[in-house]
Amino acid sequence: MSITRIWTAGAVLLLLSACKPDFHVYDLRCEGLVEPLGIDSTTPHFSWKIASEKPMTQYAYEVEVDGNLWRSGRVESTQQVMVPYEGLELASRQQSRWRVRVWNQDDQVSRWSAWQRFGVGIVAPDTLRGSYIGAVPGEGRAPLLGRGFTLKKTPKQALLYVNSLGYHEVSLNGQRVSHAVLTPAVSQLNKRSLIVVYDVTEFLKRGLNQLFIAAGSGWYKPTTFGTTYEGPLVKAELDLDGEPFLVTDASWEGGWSGYADHGTWGPHGFAGEEIHAQMEPQWAPVDVVKVDSVQATMQMCEPCTIQEMLDPVSVTHVSDTSWLVDFGRVVNAQLYLQLPSLPEGHVTPVWFGDNQPDNLDPDICGSDTYISSGVPEGDVFLNRFNHHVFRYVKLDNLTEKPLKIKAYRMRTDFPKRGSFECSDQDLNNIYNLVDWTVENLAFDGYMVDCASIERLGYGGDGNASTMTLQDMADVAPLYLNWLQAWADSQQPDGGLPHTAPNPYKAGGGPYWCSFLVQAAWRSYVSYADKRLLERFYPAMVHWLDYVDTYTVDGLLKRWPDHKYRVWYLGDWAAPKGVDVKDPESIDLVNNCALCQVYLDLEQIALVLEDRVSAVKFRQRYEALAQRIHQVFFHPKTGLYGSGSQLDLVFPLLVGAVPETLMPSVVALLKGRTATLYNGHLATGLVGIPVLTEWATLSQECDWLYGLLKQPGYPGYLYMLEQGGTGVWEEWDGGRSHLHNCYNGIGSWFYQALGGIIPTAPGYRQVRIVPQVPEGLEWVRVTRNTPYGPITVYRNGSSLEVEIPVGVTAEIQGKTFGNGHWNLNYFF
């Protein structure tokens, strides 16, 4: 292996480098967020990345917080991710700023970073002032709540704290104060609501000011979490220069905004919006409502925002009064529509579809109703408190072509920096299909199964896609928010639901419940954020107490249905001919899932220095793995369980197969795949991530590559052959066409073909071992880390690697630091 190091800056004079350090810090984060205005703690953590033109190790750092709150002084440490604040005690509502500089191994120091803002939100025992208010209850109406006030002078700083049960949107003096949509993020609304803080300083003026908050029920409905009031509620507080100035109370007025939501927000019940253009509210005093038992805490993930505005690829006049709009691909979006001048009261029905243009089913993708105002220039309609999954839009009762129509694609506003491309266009197409799907499903602070039919944060779907999404994007804050909903939805006896938030009962099994453990551990591996483990470890252990209740003779058995959870699934959504209802298969899958939980909890306990529990979890894992082999292995056939792909690969992944039997079980897996399944994938939601992880760890890239390349049903290429533009819910194209069932394959592109395997939390240490399927000429992969992007480009037997400062990579037994490395790598 010959090695060449490439430095893009070229040769730099030693004298110049001594005077001007060629490294700097960038991408500063507080609690994983960029300049957050309201974190949920008085002890923040700071992170930064370092760009360097030369080989570098951070030897020391210095952090300042507002100069006098904390001056760390020079701290000799390589730590640059989640560095804890150690200064004077911070207070609720306190706004501060921080900066950092670093030294390298040659004792050169960088320039100070620019000052970065952060704020402590409203944290206990402090509480948000004001009362919950609402207006125009019933019939799904979205109220507009307003209050005028006069200022003699403008403040230096104005912060508006808003806590809504349901969604809200704020405007001040005619301007929206944020680009966020569907605010706040989701939470377990019968236990926790979220506070969002806005800096509204620039929107204020001397004299009369008008503050309006529009609100929509969203998930706050009698049919979901139950409600105190038949409509959304808002509590808000405006602070000027650190002092309370205005709160929501009986002095506010409310009226109907012209928006109404008629859906139940149960399965198939998301409906859409009825929008009356140019509606003038009939102002009346608001209702002041008392809300009990719902904790209000700061939102700790990025908001949901519009990422792009998509134009249609065609607008077709399909009848005298109907238009069919095709956006070319399925998308999770809000619809923007500008209609021509129409008579006042004219009704334009709008239908959405994710697949067939001639079968737009409102039961799946919903429908809107737009009622025109009669203004000569025509009306503009835009979804406000709902959204749709669609490729096709049909407009009825419209003779003229719409003036403008766009899809406002939205998601949680996380950085998305992962990328993949290779010499095989089939693989590129599969990757792009998965990438597009998970990006569209990660919105509002969680990841849903589908955004059209159920819109639930299923744990099974979450487990299936966690590694995929975390390889593709920096979603640490999203997982913090989502895992908080899981902990909040835990029952007093330790039982967990299958979805979180948990508005009503939904189907699944133990693999779904295990999301609390698996997602927390995998997030720690991806982002080195120990808070996740510290915060949710008690809930994980409590869930195991519940599991013990249903453990018989060393094996987990079926537990009962409850009002918050139903079914006891093994795999789900497998191809036709694979019996996921086989009782032995269900028990095998669920006990293998429990093995994964014990392995993860052992590692979590070690990180938290709970060594006694770590030993206990290891012992329980070993006992369960032995029982799985004893009970589910059939010596005569050499099979486990039903002999399905999942029943063979899951025991292999969790180490339940004795080492002496592994070759024969692998041979049976491959042989049965070839003969029984014609070389196709033959598994479902649980099986795809399990098979992917096993193939990655076992370096079975040729075999998995062959499965992916197999045309016809079932498979990803089949979806593409049939015109799919998102991953389907079922292999045959049933139900949703933008779904989270089969996205677990995404991690294979990064960890197998790119060969980027973490060996320390936060990817601080990695092993780079690209796997090379026969016939795949080249691969280029970029995987972002808390330290910066890692890029791997393999072309034939040569390898180029880009490693950020702070990361060390092991490649064929040699250790490499930051820089651009060009290797002749003999596979």
Whereabouts are the PLM-identified features?
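C-terminal capping/lid segments that line or modulate ligand- or cofactor-binding pockets
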Residues: L211, T264-H276, I453-E454, M472, ...
